[in-house]
């Protein structure tokens, strides 16, 4: 996968280029990652990248010319590498990201993410140069860098070969629309600060893979129903899941 990012703070992306799953994917050549700074496309000695909005009001907007030139450079680089890129603007008014959206984005071979700053960008630029707007949630951030890293990390996990275990992405929370089941590691008995002992569920120690599968499915359904019940509204559960959920609802009141 080819990924480009346009940002006034490209250094922030060291968090994903140098560390973790995404860093390893870049080093292994599974993700081809590039950065563009609109400041590099300015024509004044101050490298100005902001401008006042028409109509007045607080705050500034990202200047059109440097940003538009950066987008053009990113698009051209993507085409040189084999095809047209989809340009994504991280924006509060965009489609809210969920796992379905991540899966859709992962179907594209080339993506360019624009990390906005200040009060945003000119609406005409959104109409003419942006393909899609995406939001990571209904809250305020100082810029689009963190949302861009959020999306890139989520998408990267679906790139073939990025995760060490082929089933890891399939078993993550939301991959099947449900929250993930609880997980446990050593020690088998954990002592709390209050002196209580908490043990690993016996089924996980049984070695019976079918019992473990059913337990994990039940726990996933239970956790989703008690913590995020709205997620169940749009899911097409299997007959086995429907039966398990019905039993859970009878047992937990």
UniProtKB/Swiss-Prot annotation:
Biological-process GO terms, alphabetical: tRNA N1-guanine methylation
Primary role: Specifically methylates guanosine-37 in various tRNAs.
One Gene Ontology term, aspect cellular component: cytosol
Keywords: Cytoplasm, Methyltransferase, S-adenosyl-L-methionine, Transferase, tRNA processing
Broad class of the protein's primary localization: cytoplasm
Single GO MF annotation: tRNA (guanine(37)-N1)-methyltransferase activity
Family assignment from sequence similarity: Belongs to the RNA methyltransferase TrmD family.
EC nos: 2.1.1.228
InterPro entries: Alpha/beta_knot_MTases, tRNA_m1G_MeTrfase_C_sf, tRNA_m1G_MeTrfase_TrmD, tRNA_m1G_MTases_N, tRNA_MeTrfase_TRMD/TRM10
Organism of origin: Colwellia psychrerythraea (strain 34H / ATCC BAA-681) (Vibrio psychroerythus)
UniProt-listed CDD domains: TrmD-like (cd18080)
Binding site for S-adenosyl-L-methionine: 116, 136-141
Listed name of the protein: tRNA (guanine-N(1)-)-methyltransferase
Source taxon at top rank: Bacteria
Alphabetized PANTHER family for the sequence: TRNA (GUANINE-N(1)-)-METHYLTRANSFERASE
């Amino acid at each position: 996968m080819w990924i480009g990012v346009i940002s006034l703070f490209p250094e922030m992306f060291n968090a994903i280029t140098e560390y973790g799953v995404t860093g390893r994917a870049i080093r292994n050549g599974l993700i081809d990652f590039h950065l563009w700074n609109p400041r590099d496309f300015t024509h004044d000695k101050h490298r100005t990248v902001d401008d006042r909005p028409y109509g007045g009001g607080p705050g500034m907007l990202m200047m059109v010319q440097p940003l538009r030139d950066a987008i053009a450079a990113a698009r051209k680089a993507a085409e040189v590498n084999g095809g047209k890129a989809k340009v994504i603007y991280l924006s509060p008014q965009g489609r809210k990201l969920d796992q379905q959206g991540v899966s859709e984005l992962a179907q594209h071979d080339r993506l360019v993410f624009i990390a906005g700053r200040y009060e945003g960008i000119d609406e005409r630029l959104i109409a003419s140069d942006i393909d899609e707007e995406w939001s990571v949630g209904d809250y305020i951030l100082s810029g689009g860098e963190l949302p861009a890293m959020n999306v890139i990390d989520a998408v990267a996990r679906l790139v073939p070969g990025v995760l060490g275990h082929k089933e890891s992405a399939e078993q993550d929370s939301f991959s099947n629309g449900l929250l993930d089941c609880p997980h446990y590691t050593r020690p088998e008995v954990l002592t709390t600060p209050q002196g209580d002992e908490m043990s690993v569920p016996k089924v996980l120690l049984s070695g019976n893979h079918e019992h473990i599968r059913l337990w994990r499915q039940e726990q996933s359904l239970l956790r989703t129903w008690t913590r995020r019940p709205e997620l169940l509204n749009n899911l097409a559960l299997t007959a086995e899941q429907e039966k398990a959920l019905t039993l859970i609802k009878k047992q937990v009141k």
